[in-house]
Amino acid sequence: MTHWFHRNPLKATAPVSFNYYGMITGPPASKICNDLRSARTRLLELFTDLSCNPETMKNAADLYFSLLQGFINSVGDSTQESKLRYIQNFKWTDTLQGHVPSAQQDAVFELISMGFNVALWYTKYASRLAGKENITEDEAKEVHRSLKIAAGIFKHLKESHIPKLLTPAEKGRDLEARLIDAYIIQCQAEAQEVTIARAIELKHAPGLIAALAYETASFYQKADHTLSSLEPAHSAKWRKYLHLKMCFYTAYAYCYHGQTLLASDKCGEAIRSLQEAEKLYAEAEALCKEYGETKGPGPTAKPSGHLFFRKLGSLVKNTLDKCQRENGFIYFQKIPTEAPQLELKANYGLVEPVPFEFPPMSALWTPEALAAFDLTKRPKDDSIKPKPEEEVKPVKEPDIKPQKDTGCSVS
């Protein structure tokens, strides 16, 4: 399933030296600043390192975030704000807005932005792993878990940290509610795709598969609706992907619902359900073409070329043919003019984000270390403050070549 998932670019950031020569009055503060600089550099490097795995990413992220906590919370009292929170300006681009960054002189902004990139890394890791030629069951579980972890990070940022920013996120930027909600919902939907593929492979009841597909389609529809008020120039490509996935999984729901109806001797209704699946599958095919032609951030996924996509077309056709034959020989039922209403509720397999918390403050942050930062010696002329409108060099992400499609789904 290489290139089955749409991915927006990673956020890019300006370098941060953590050099406060005049303010630092002792070795503990110097060590913290040196460690912060190297931990940040290391974490940024790992975002584009194809050999990086979740354990390596978690360790590197925890190290940086534990050090950064001393710039956010007071040592020994996490309810109090650190005196260092506003001494450093941070610049980050947004996933849909090109190379012109947002800038805030606030360590909370850095925590959120870097955390956002960690979540994006988990989604990209899941996409790469799902694209392996012969994915194992353990790898499929890791895809599933990585997407749930990403959803949990996005959710935690939205609920616990973005509200703490003094400067609210601008419209269309990553940290505003519409975008972060869309990322959360997309992660949940993609994790449920893994569940559906598994349920199909294990030949679970058609009713369960139909319900899971319907719930997944509803997730994609909700994510698309969340982005509907954004500028089309920024969101059109992403929304095409969400729309095509919504059509694809609604077609899946109608296909498997048709099988359930046939098993209940409701052949006429089954035929109508399969006809609806056929129509929606054709719509998904057309949307794949439109998606490929739509300009926007991120590389173009190629869902219509996958066996997982094409298998549905064959399944719909064969099941519809079977229903029509059975109706001609056995049932002789009238085919309804209206497609059946899908009021399906899955009782199993629904995805919830994995709860996330940032690590506690590093043990390097002692009262002595904090005291070694003397804000009275801070330069009065803050001429080093970067201008928000200056462009930040984009992250050069590795190009993932599609592997041979063997038809193995993430299962």
From Swiss-Prot:
Protein name per the record: BRO1 domain-containing protein BROX
Q: Does the keyword Isomerase apply?
A: no
UniProt-listed GO biological process terms? mitotic nuclear membrane reassembly
Propeptide found at 409-411
Give the organism's phylogenetic lineage.
Eukaryota, Metazoa, Chordata, Craniata, Vertebrata
What is known about what this protein does?
A: Nuclear envelope-associated factor that is involved in the nuclear envelope ruptures during interphase (NERDI) repair, where it is locally recruited by CHMP5 and reduces cytoskeletal stress through its action on SYN2 to help reseal the ruptured membrane.
Its cellular-component GO annotations read: nuclear envelope; nuclear membrane
Q: Where is the composition biased (Basic and acidic residues)?
A: 376-404
Q: Which InterPro entries match?
A: BRO1_dom (IPR004328), BRO1_sf (IPR038499), BROX (IPR038898)
Q: How does it assemble?
A: Monomer. Interacts with CHMP4B. Interacts with CHMP5: this interaction allows the recruitment of BROX to cellular membranes. Interacts with SYN2; this interaction promotes SYN2 ubiquitination and facilitates the relaxation of mechanical stress imposed by compressive actin fibers at the rupture site.
The subcellular location is: Nucleus membrane
The record, for PROSITE patterns, names: BRO1
Report the sequence similarity comment from the record.
Belongs to the BROX family.
Q: Where is the lipid attached (S-farnesyl cysteine)?
A: 408
Q: How does it sit in the membrane?
A: Lipid-anchor
Q: Name one Pfam family in it.
A: BRO1
Q: Which CDD domains match?
A: BRO1_Brox_like
